[in-house]
Amino acid sequence: MRSLRIRLRVPDDFRPGILGLWHKDLLASTAAFKDKNVHILVSESNDGEFFAQAAKQLHYEVTRGSDTHGATNVRHLLKSLKNDRFVGMALDGPHGPALQVKPGSLWLSKASGRPLWLFCIKYGKHFRLNGWDNFIIPLPLTAIDIEIKYLLPENNSK
C-alpha cells in the first residue's frame, strides 16, 4: 500500500462524519486514510478478521460488527462521531448486494447529525476478484484518484 500514489480531493467544508465506501474499494480507501485517527466498522467474519488486523497496523480503531451486536457497535461509533472523529464503513455491507446502500450508515448519519461522505474512486492499473463485490486490488505504483462527495449533508434528521 505504500507504493500507491493516492490523490485525494475533498470539499472545502470536509469535516468529521461517516466515510462511506463500497466494499470493492476497501484497499484504496484504507490506504487513503491510514494514520488519520479513523474508527472503522469491520465484519465479524473470517475475512473481516484479516482486514481488522491489517487496519490496526495502519492505526485505525476497529469495532467488529454483526447483526446480533448492533447496539454495542453503534454506541462505539456514535461516541467517536461525538468526539469529532471520522467513522468508516462499507455502505453495501460485508455481503452485498454490491453498490446498494444498507440502512445502517444512513441511520448513523441521521442519529449523529454528521454528514455521510461518499468515496468516488478511479483506479490506474488494477485487477478485480470474481466475487459478489468485484473487489479491486490496485497494482503497485499505480495512481488512484479519490474524490469525496456528500451522500447526506450534516444535520439531516428531517
Spell out what each predicted region is.
Residues 77-108, 112:
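Catalytic-site beta-strand/loop segments enriched in glycine and acidic/polar residues
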Residues 56-70, 74-81, 150-153:
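Extended, non-globular alpha-helical segments
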Residues 100-157:
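A cross-family acyltransferase "interaction/gating" segment
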Residues 1-34, 60, 135, 139-146:
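Membrane-anchoring hydrophobic helices of lipid-metabolizing enzymes
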Residues 65, 90, 118-121:
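Generic beta-sheet signal
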Residues 16-69, 112, 124-129:
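Catalytic core of membrane glycerolipid acyltransferases/transacylases, capturing the structured
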Residues 47, 51, 70-73, 77, ...:
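Amphipathic alpha-helical interface surfaces
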